[in-house]
């Protein structure tokens, strides 16, 4: 079992009593145009009802990717549990070219054995298969892992279903209304990382998934902190007079970029995490904020209003050269996130009175508007670059939304108990 997931499981158990509303994905657009696939209900080898429906989890994962449309079990001509039982000819006419079969077996000491096979219908070939022996708490993780493997085999893209999201919830209560939460990417297994009577903002994952940087106001003004998720210990990074915000870990894990206004103007700074030394990156009278790292950990994208309105710029952290403006498409561009492969930006594009999430190709400069929701902000990209999570306004509430990076698939993640903001997608865990 991976160390980071042992740590997350311990936190999950610790905070079980604090679980309240859960984010749940609701598909809003894009399923009908996706690739049909069949995920046959898994055979259950046990004496009571299974604790989790593994096939349902895999189906949901594949559907949530926007690339697959699992058919309803009622349309399946048969329900085999192994590839050898599958009659490929019976599936012709459904538009399905791959079938997932499997079973879950109850064992001793609260352990379960999950097995699955992905079968190509045209040849009857088993494309991939695996087994997982897990305790009940890890059943969903095993299902997400199977989804990752199936997704990668069928698309060539590494799956991100076993990743997590961090986000801030402002609850409708007077006592400790602000919560920093982590959940599975699909909203299951949420737990509270930190509670406060004061606002919490801008969570950012370390590249190893073991820490979160964020902004709190415990001292009466903004402060940047890093919290170790295993121990719960909190390290204060910056608590200067004025604004302290917008933390971003470098991909190599050695540096943290952030924005400070300690000298009056809002500028980008960087801390070497080993030494604690802080270096100023931008130096101007304009507002410079929202840093996002390029994959090489040498360059930053950031938002600046040096041209009058917010636009996105690129800067070399070594101090060589001058900042380069990289957005020109709209009146305002901000809240940029550089894709993990460095090929595109996801940002908030403001044009013609609309504020939407957009994708800009960093080679061609082409811009595609991805969303049609209201007051979109703070986008965060999945580590496999296929999906974006962001916050928007719906019925006067702040909610989380998903959109695929091709713009074809959209989903809503409603939180029933409060305003949900500042989503941050984890790295691979």
From Swiss-Prot:
Q: Please list the GO biological process terms of this entry.
A: cell division; protein import
Q: Where does this polypeptide localize?
A: Periplasm
NCBIfam families in the cross-refs: propeller_TolB
Per its UniProt entry, which superkingdom is the organism in? Bacteria
Q: Which organism is it from?
A: Hamiltonella defensa subsp. Acyrthosiphon pisum (strain 5AT)
Q: Which residues constitute the signal peptide according to the record? A: 1-21
Which PANTHER family did the record assign? PROTEIN TOLB, PROTEIN TOLB HOMOLOG
Recorded protein name is: Tol-Pal system protein TolB
Q: How does it assemble?
A: The Tol-Pal system is composed of five core proteins: the inner membrane proteins TolA, TolQ and TolR, the periplasmic protein TolB and the outer membrane protein Pal. They form a network linking the inner and outer membranes and the peptidoglycan layer.
Q: What is the lineage of its organism?
A: Bacteria, Pseudomonadati, Pseudomonadota, Gammaproteobacteria, Enterobacterales
